[in-house]
């Protein structure tokens, strides 16, 4: 899975791109002048996430399939924990928790193991969990919230 930025990303956008790639065990590149076809080539037959900006801040995620077709997009504002700088991301695939349209879209895109919200507390201590709700997407590690996306809009194509 490849995660990339808009063409001229701000430092905040690059930071979010790197965090997402570490969380979902994907690969992060800075887009530069690459077009969509070049990005699809870099994705090596896998899906693609493009982090877009709104007023210089990360504000949109576009989720593309391996052919470059936009599947869905998510508009958001972001929040980071003070612990994020010292957190070590294990090289494990995260699990997905949550209900609703966004959680369903994430399940079909990422193919992560999905668990019920009640089962999250029973996961091993180093587990990373993507908790997707209709208003908020919480990225947790070792039981702590690392960063969140406050959902402002969701659109399927």
UniProtKB/Swiss-Prot annotation:
Brix domain location is: 1-157
Query: Tell me, which GO biological process terms does this entry list?
Result: rRNA processing
Source organism's superkingdom? Archaea
Query: Record's PROSITE patterns?
Result: BRIX (PS50833)
Q: Which GO terms describe its molecular function?
A: rRNA binding
Database matches in InterPro entries: Brix, Brix_dom_Rbsml_bgen_prot
- This protein's UniProt keywords: Ribosome biogenesis
Q: Where is the signal peptide?
A: none
Functional description taken from the UniProt entry: Probably involved in the biogenesis of the ribosome.
Protein name in the entry: Probable Brix domain-containing ribosomal biogenesis protein
Organism, as annotated: Methanosarcina acetivorans (strain ATCC 35395 / DSM 2834 / JCM 12185 / C2A)
């Amino acid at each position: 899975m490849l995660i990339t930025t808009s063409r001229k990303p701000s430092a905040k956008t690059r930071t979010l791109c790197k965090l997402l790639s570490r969380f979902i065990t994907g690969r992060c590149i800075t887009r530069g002048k690459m077009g969509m076809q070049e990005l699809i080539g870099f994705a090596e037959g896998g899906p693609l996430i493009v982090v877009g900006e709104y007023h210089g801040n990360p504000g949109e995620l576009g989720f593309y399939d391996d052919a470059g077709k936009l599947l869905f997009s998510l508009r958001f504002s972001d929040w980071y924990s003070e612990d994020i700088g010292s957190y070590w991301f294990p090289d494990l695939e995260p699990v997905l928790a949550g209900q609703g349209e966004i959680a369903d879209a994430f399940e079909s895109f990422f193919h992560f193991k999905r668990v019920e919200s009640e089962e999250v507390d029973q996961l091993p201590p180093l587990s990373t969990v993507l908790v997707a709700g209709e208003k908020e997407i919480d990225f947790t590690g070792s039981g702590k919230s690392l960063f969140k996306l406050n959902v402002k809009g969701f659109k399927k194509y």
